[in-house]
Design a protein with these regions (language model features):
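Short, small/hydrophobic-residue-rich motifs at membrane-helix boundaries and re-entrant hairpins
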Residues: 1-11
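A generic local structural motif
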Residues: 2-4, 29-30, 101-103
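Short beta-strand segments
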Residues: 12-46
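Short, structured beta-strand-loop surface elements
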Residues: 40, 47-122
Length: 125
């Protein structure tokens, strides 16, 4: 089931995040917009401390379904002082659909950001 407030993010680059629910143990799906900054990819939480954020923190891994095969990844939350550049890149990609979120919650600390690393990359590193 997709969160209706997040479904408004349907723009180019939207992928479906699947992460195990921290309480239910069941797969939870939500649309996200991965953003690349340099050679790293990230997931940004425009709505703040949402369910998918808490689930991803607990699980430490998930899957992205977008173009072709699902991508299994590990996730590492980045420190607040490292979020600004990633959030700026995200806002450019996501556009007006998320601007209200960032006006309401302007502090980068209100928007968890996870660096995602493909399981294949993680195994090699």
């Amino acid at each position: 089931m997709v969160n209706p407030s997040v479904s408004r993010l349907r723009t180019g680059g939207v992928e479906e995040l699947t992460v195990t629910g921290r309480r239910s143990g069941q797969p939870r799906r939500v649309p996200v917009i991965p953003v690349q900054v340099g050679t790293h990819r990230y997931l940004v939480a425009p709505f703040g401390e949402s369910g998918w954020v808490q689930n991803l923190r607990a699980a430490g891994e998930g899957q992205l379904h977008g173009h072709g095969q699902p991508e299994h990844f590990v996730a590492h939350e980045i420190a607040v002082d490292q979020r600004a550049e990633v959030i700026d890149g995200y806002r450019k990609i996501a556009g007006r659909s998320v601007e209200r979120c960032f006006r309401s919650l302007p502090d980068p600390g209100d928007h968890p950001v996870f660096e995602i690393e493909s399981r294949l990359d993680a195994a090699a590193g």
